[in-house]
Amino acid sequence: MPEHLPGLEVAARYRPCRAGLDIGGDWYDAFLMTDGAIAVEIGDAQGHDVDAAAFMGQVRSSMRALAAHEPDPSSVLTHTNQLLIAMGAPRFASCTMLHIDPHSGQVTGANAGHVPLLAAHQDGSHEIHALPGGPVLGILPNADYPDETFTLDRDTALVMVTDGVVEGPDLSLDAGLERTGTLAAQAVHDGLSADETADLVLDAAVALNHPDDLAVLVVRRI
């Protein structure tokens, strides 16, 4: 992921499930599009081993290549799903993809079976934002992935995570999203940077000691 993306402050954190592995099935990515928009994505490939990491790399590379020619997240997810099915992919993957116009704050996003994103506001409030979309990638042929457009204000941070951050044996998804949203909103209220917010969210997830890969992506307009 580039160190600098014009108009945005983006921070990412990752912790693999297995000790000794630098990578697992979770991934994130952010890159500049030809039209000046910035593509941001986070995903979770099935499994935690080396094979999961290899599959994750295929999905991530495919999405980046498709994004160079497709106009929106809906098209990228649709064609990635078709590609994985045509390849007979042995695994599936969930993903959220956003296209962000850093000047206007317009965000277009779609979801493929991934956990909702969080919007953390400067006033200390937060929202759980469930984007429209379809099933996980690589399972159902001809699946549709409708998208949604909304505005990212400058006093708001988008927090994107994988399920290991917000769900586990002793933590329901709803409770985990609420917990993470509250933590992120307090960080934004306190004036913390995207990097500091990402650290807080990851550290809180690590403390739960869930046996899963963890990925966090925080996005703010500057």
Q: Model regions: which residues?
A:
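Short beta-strands and strand-coil junctions in structured, solvent-facing domains, enriched
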Residues: 48, 167-168
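Cytochrome P450 core scaffold surrounding the K-helix E-X-X-R motif
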Residues: 119-121, 169-173
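Divalent-cation-assisted or electrostatically stabilized phosphate/pyrophosphate-binding catalytic cores
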Residues: 153, 175-188
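PAS/GAF/H-NOX family sensory domains and closely associated sensor/linker modules
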Residues: 71, 191-192
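… and, occasionally, acidic/histidine-rich disordered N-termini of signaling adaptors
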Residues: 1-159, 199-203, 208-222
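Short, glycine/charged-enriched secondary-structure capping and boundary segments
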Residues: 55-57, 173-176
